[in-house]
Every structure is written in structure tokens, then in C-alpha cells.
Amino acid sequence: MGEDVKNLNYAQLKKLRHEVESNIASNQVGQAIADHEETISHCLHCNSHQLNRWGMTRQGIQRFKCKSCNKTFNALADSPLYRMKKSEKWIEYTKLMWEGVSLRKSAKALDITLRTSFRWRHMFIKAPASFNPSELTGVIEADETFLPESFKGKRVIDRKSRKRGGGRIKQVPIFIALDRSGAVSHKVLERNTKENIQAQLKPLLSSGSVLCTDGNLSYKGIAKELDVDHKRLIPLDNQLVIDGVYHIQTLNNYMKRWKGWLKRFNGIGTDYVENYLSWFRFMEDNGEYSDQTWIKEAL
């Protein structure tokens, strides 16, 4: 076979490489799905644990039939990958996502439509976006950041056309809180009010935690109402660190990295900000890319 490969021209080698990489990707996706199939223990319809294996789909995905309700489902029915086609391209697509490649360039690289590229992006983000920590511990840093309101990706804009030079663009508030263990919680707020901030912050506070914020008076009132130890860091008073431990620099650095990463997308629609927050958090949590990282998360 080695001699045969040597006799191939550049175009043939390129085609062979593509076929080999596609086969490897398909095997890795198949292995991840097979591993997932072994974890299925209850019916998606009635939650019964009385299941029978019930053949395969045309794509080779295991089907199950519930003895209790007689309904059937396949192993991907409860995952974002359900009904997604072209599985041989999934891993390469997630690699392009990790690199922050645009939808258009990803579509061209994998010979898929722009619509498919868009749908895949948000399908792979769906699993990370479904998770938000229920509680933060220890030293908790909290603050808001802002992005210009954007209707990018919307067919219908729910406002009158903006006149040229017609004032400032509305800023969308985003609440972010994290602890020193690396857990991050985020939420796009309708308005930057004390009530909205408190609604997001209150469930995150745990016993014995210390809240670190900037000088925003909303946090002062919230901390008093919730009876939580509160450290206010006020730059104008040159107070950036208290007792060598309490600061919001970890959070500020996180926000800076996120906004720096966002620049490659040339603006994102406000409706999708939560997804991009989750996407970035997912990559930060994993540290580096591996071929099955996103596939396993989606399952």
C-alpha cells in the first residue's frame, strides 16, 4: 500500500487524506455514541427502567422499547445530536468551533450549507448552555458587563429604524459571578436593576461565602438584605485588594478574555449572548481541545 500511496498525485492524496480523516472521525463519533448507549437505563417517555433493545436506526443508532408504555426511542433522542446528519463531519466542525472560525468559513470548509453551519453551532452549544452552577462557594466575585443591543440574525426587528446620529445604542447588561474554584454563573438581564441582580445572586450565595464587588450601591443593599459578608472594591479610592485576598480581578480578567474572544465574530445578536457565554465557559473549563470533547458533552 505504501508504494501505491507514493504514486498518487497531489489531488489524489488530498482526497485520500479527506477520506481517512472522515473515517477516523466517524469511528470516534460512533464510539462515543456506543458508550452513551450503554448508559441508557430508563424510558424517555415514562421513566420506567424496563427496557428492551429494539433494533437499530439506518445510521446504526441503538433503538429501545419500553415494556411499560410500549413507546420506542433511539439513543440520541434526548441529546442535541438527535436528527443531526453527516456525523462524519461533526468532529471537524467542533474543531472549527474551538478555533472560532466563522459560520461561513466553516460551511465552506466542510461543504455544508450556511444554514446547517448555524444550526450545528447552536446544537453543540445547547448542552453547555443548559448548565449553570446552582451555588458558588468561598470568595465570590460578582459584577455586570455590557454589550450593545444587536438584532443580528433576526428576520424581524422589534423597533423603529434608528435614525443616523440618533443617540446612543442601548446597552444590554450581563451579570457574571464566579468563585475561586472556577465555577462561573452568568445571565443576560432585561434591565440593570438591584432587583434583577439580587434575583440572580441570591441562589448562588452559600453559607460562609464572602461577596466581592465593585462600588455599585446595588450590591451594598443586596448584601445587607441577605446578611452576607461583603467586600466593596472601589478603584477611585485606590482600593483594589482587601487583606491581600478579596478582589474582583479574577472576574475582570474573565470578562476581558470573553470580550476579546467575542471580537472574532464581528458582533453577535442579543438573543444569542447566553449561548456565547456558555460556549466560552465550556472551553475555559476544558482547557484544550480533544476530538471527543464536544461530542461527549452533547450526549
Report the location of each language-model feature:
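Residue-level recognition of single "structural anchor" positions
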Residues: 1-299
